[in-house]
Amino acid sequence: MKEVTANKFQRVEQTDIGEEWNGTSLTYWKSVRIAFFQNKVAIITATILLIIIAMAIIYPTVSKYSYLQQDYKIRNLKPSMLHFFGTDEGGRDIFTGVWQAARISLLLGIIIALINLTIGMIYGGICSYYGGLTDDVLMRIIEILANIPLLVIVVQVNLILGPSIFTFVIAMTISGWCNIASLIRGQFIQQKEQEYILAAKALGASTSRIVSKHLMRNIISIAIVTITLEIPSIILLESMLSFIGFGSAMLSWGKMFYTASFAIHFYPYQVLMPAFVISITIICFNILGDALRDAFNPHEVVLKK
């Protein structure tokens, strides 16, 4: 047997063997942004929504027609180049009215969604963090409120306070936050068992700090998706309630439906034109919400290199 000596081996340098990483690391929010902008449908949807919001803000101000002024000489005109959506029973330009009503409908949707989200996050956070008897009692309250029909709440609040925007906001927020609170509670329960929460408790962090600095930050993505999907639901509910006479007192899309419903058999365009804008708005919000949900979920998003 030949003897193996050191001179039969050659030293191999290690400098060129190791793998080198020349790429840039992605933070969570950067990966979300990349995933969202890769979704072409989401970009188109967001652009349409921005146009709708811009039209609601700008067009009623620059339009040569005022929806508040009636002109019976041009009543019930069909859509034309002068009046894109035609005119109504009072001779008012429907195209101008749609964008003026959009101000109230969109504003109500955003305000009510923000209020419901705020109440739901606080309530759901308290339920999940303390647990036990506190959680049981608070969840029973949610079950009671959530099972009261919305129409009953709206009618009772209108009878007590009278029809107004303030009344409508109160009616929509009495039980509107319940589903959000249940969703946030479930997310909080998942998060509070994580190691970083246990570490914060071990370091002596207060309850308020743990909730605000740790738990809230980790469900912000859920909050963004929730509010995006909540807005179209509120707009649709406002339109439905205004159509049956229980909506806000000011001009809104639902109010336009209610006014045009008396002439729908003779002038269907007076309902169809506002309905088209409302449908586009609601569809865009729902598509945007789904796109945001996909972008915020790192387990389902596949980033292109």
Where are these regions (language model features)?
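Gly/Trp-centered helix-boundary motif
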Residues: 1-117, 121, 125, 132-136, ...
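Residue-level recognition of transmembrane alpha-helices
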Residues: 48-49, 97, 139, 143, ...
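Transmembrane alpha-helix boundary and packing residues in multipass membrane permease domains
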Residues: 52, 125, 154-159, 168, ...
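Short helix-capping/hinge motifs at transmembrane helix termini and TM-loop junctions
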Residues: 59-66, 128-132, 157-163, 175, ...
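Generic hydrophobic transmembrane alpha-helix motif, especially the helices
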Residues: 84, 88, 118-120, 128-191, ...
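Amphipathic cytosolic juxtamembrane alpha-helices at the membrane-cytosol interface
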Residues: 92-107, 131-139, 189, 193, ...
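Transmembrane alpha-helices
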Residues: 103-119, 154, 208-238, 285
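Glycine-rich helix-loop "coupling/hinge" segments at transmembrane-helix boundaries
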Residues: 159-160, 172, 187-188, 236-277, ...
